[in-house]
Amino acid sequence: MTQQITVTEHLLLHQKQIPGATGQFTHLFNELVLSAKIISREVNKAGLVDVLGFTGEVNVQGEEVKKLDEYANRILIHRMARSGVLCAMASEENADIIEIPHGLPQGNYIIIFDPLDGSSNIDVNVNIGTIFSIFRRKSKLGTPVQSTDVLQAGCEQVAAGYILYGSSTMLVFTTGDGVHGFTMDPGVGEFLLSHPNMKIPDTGNIYSVNEGYWPYWSEATKKVVGHFKSRDNIHGKPYSLRYIGSLVADFHRNLIYGGVFMYPADDRDPKKPRGKLRLLCEASPMAMLIEQAGGRATDGTQRILDIIPDDLHQRVPLFIGSRHEVETISNIYKENEG
């Protein structure tokens, strides 16, 4: 049953337990929540107003930009820049680090986001989401932001989460003390605590992957996927395939039911030999969430949260979900790619 605890109340309770807390993080999160409400409003009426289809532009990833994707990006940049506690931002849609405009107050936090994950599904009314990651800067406040302030390993995150726009709008996040889910109550316009202390089952029976890319995978990756399609596993029968094609939606289902999401490296595009997903705005925040929920995340050989990025839009293979399934994947790669 939903508890009548708002996101702000939850954060303030947590803030009291931290010596020297200034309230800046809570203020930052309040702006993020407001952005989510604005984006959710537009998503819910997407078929009624002119926000479907493409803008005609191509983003830094070489992808055609959806109108709603561009809208979400613009809202997040505008709102978050005015939070007064950020020194920089980064977005999947922008080639470079986004600086806080001159004249606006700044702080020690950095936010990195994918404004609308799963945007290829927008026009067909499939669940989509916003993914975010929050760091503290390493350089001194008042000095220019350095690339090292943004290019931090996932284990340095102070918070991570996502907003899922579906049959209801949900905010799921962690600040390092477990994973908590809040559901938007449209009657009062607030996110209320609905899923406290979320935990992923230690093993599941779902695997999520686009098997259409099978011809482009390495032999080791084919053995990984083949393991879940066979009866030679912990369940003695094939896992169920469930794949939406929206990372947030697939991740959220597996978080609740257990299972594993996979986006392996492939050789479809020589420009993307490490797969499609971005380390900073997709893999790292999801990895922090899953580990806080008791799961695991790897690129096949290395823990996602240990990877130090060398590029703002660096891509990584991603295997994320229940502990048993991810450890099995790591073992298969170790045996076949040693």
Curated annotation (Swiss-Prot):
Q: Where does substrate bind?
A: 117-120, 210, 243, 276
* Top-rank taxon: Bacteria
- Quick one: a GO biological-process term for this protein? fructose metabolic process
State the needed cofactors, names only. Answer: Mg(2+)
Question: So what does this thing catalyse?
Answer: beta-D-fructose 1,6-bisphosphate + H2O = beta-D-fructose 6-phosphate + phosphate
Which residues does the annotation say bind Mg(2+) 2? 114, 117, 282
Which residues make up the binding site for Mg(2+) 1? 92, 114, 116
Q: Which GO terms describe its molecular function?
A: fructose 1,6-bisphosphate 1-phosphatase activity; magnesium ion binding
Instruction: Give the CC-aspect GO terms.
Output: cytosol
Question: Which EC number(s) does UniProt give?
Answer: 3.1.3.11
Q: What is the top EC class of this enzyme, as a single word?
A: hydrolase
Q: Which UniProt keywords apply?
A: Carbohydrate metabolism, Cytoplasm, Hydrolase, Magnesium, Metal-binding
Q: What is its main location?
A: cytoplasm
Quaternary structure note: Homotetramer.
PANTHER family, per the entry: FRUCTOSE-1,6-BISPHOSPHATASE-RELATED, SEDOHEPTULOSE-1,7-BISPHOSPHATASE, CHLOROPLASTIC
**What name goes with this protein?**
Fructose-1,6-bisphosphatase class 1
At the highest ranks, the source species' classification is:
Bacteria, Pseudomonadati, Thermodesulfobacteriota, Desulfovibrionia, Desulfovibrionales
Q: What gene is this protein translated from?
A: fbp
